[in-house]
């Protein structure tokens, strides 16, 4: 079963096992502002998404990462769709992303 929830302080070790870009002191902001999500497969964390606000108002996805063992199963697509629905429900009419291959 797949579940997606907000990141918590207790997810910090998992978070940094996948996210090598976020300064460690920023993690508390991600959790406090609810700008990070954890994807769980059968209760085990396997992916994450974080975002910031561009121009202080436009949601901008700054990282989407799925553990290597779970890639190719559509989990990234599900995580992105979850974020898009939530941002739309909050009134955002535009979202931004950036990719690196």
Model-derived features with residue positions:
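Acetyl-CoA-dependent GNAT
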Residues: 2, 6-62, 67-68, 86
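Short, structured secondary-structure boundary patches
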Residues: 49, 72-74, 101
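Conserved GNAT acetyl-CoA-binding A-motif
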Residues: 87-100
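Generic N-terminal initiation segments characterized by hydrophobic and/or small/turn-forming residues
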Residues: 15, 45, 77, 92-93
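Conserved acetyl-CoA pyrophosphate-binding loop and the N-cap/start of the following alpha-helix
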Residues: 70, 74-82
């Amino acid at each position: 079963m797949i579940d997606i929830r907000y990141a918590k302080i207790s997810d910090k070790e998992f978070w940094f096992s996948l996210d090598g870009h976020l300064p460690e002191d920023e993690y508390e902001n991600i959790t406090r502002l609810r700008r990070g999500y954890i994807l769980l497969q059968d209760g085990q964390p396997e992916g994450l998404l974080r975002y910031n606000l561009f121009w202080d108002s436009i949601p901008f996805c700054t990282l989407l990462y799925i553990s290597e063992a779970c890639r190719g199963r559509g989990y990234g697509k599900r995580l992105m769709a979850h974020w898009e629905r939530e941002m739309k429900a909050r009134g955002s009419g535009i979202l931004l992303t950036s990719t690196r291959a």
